[in-house]
Amino acid sequence: MKKTFAILLLLAVMKMSAQVVPTFFPRKFLLEHFTSANCNQCPMGMKYIVEYLDRQTTPYIWVSHHAVYGTDEYTIPASNAIAMNYLGMNSVPSVVFNRSKQDGLLVIGAWDIENLVVEDDTVAEASVMIEHQYDAATRRLDITVSGQVANMDRTAYLLSILIKENGLVGKQEDAYCSWKGRKWKEYMHPRVVRDFVTATFGDTVRVENQAYSYSV
């Protein structure tokens, strides 16, 4: 799986275009989940996330970074850069909404998580559409990203594109297992961030009907 993934990335191509329109757009909230296979409390953190998302009607994007708590087979430098260098994070499990910090709060359950999301009804300044084509014979992935932005003075935006993989089965420490005299269990890791197509914190794009292309 790792070999296939690496080859796929080498052949990926991304193109982006955008145009200005006089409107705003419904917003999806970004949920960045920080976890580690070495963290025995992280399965409980996952339980709270799922309970919260099961009640949501607002569209969301969920990605999981394996970071902070040592390294495991899914840890990448970009995830640690976001968690520790940008957010100042020093423990997992942790959740960040729309990449903004909530200082001084200890979140312990799904109800508390819900109370922290204050931007669900905020309109977005841009829309994003992603299309892709995959050629299994050549392992080539073509990604096309298009969008519209609100007609306002701001003409430059940061565009972040990452690749995530769902349903990865691997080892996971679990506090419940330790009570049973075992350290590890087989665990399904969802929505794991595997790599960034753009720079970790996004590439600056200007929207005067321009197109951008990337090869990685």
Segments (PLM) and residue ranges:
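A generic structural signal for short, solvent-exposed coil/turn residues
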Residues: 10, 23, 31, 54, ...
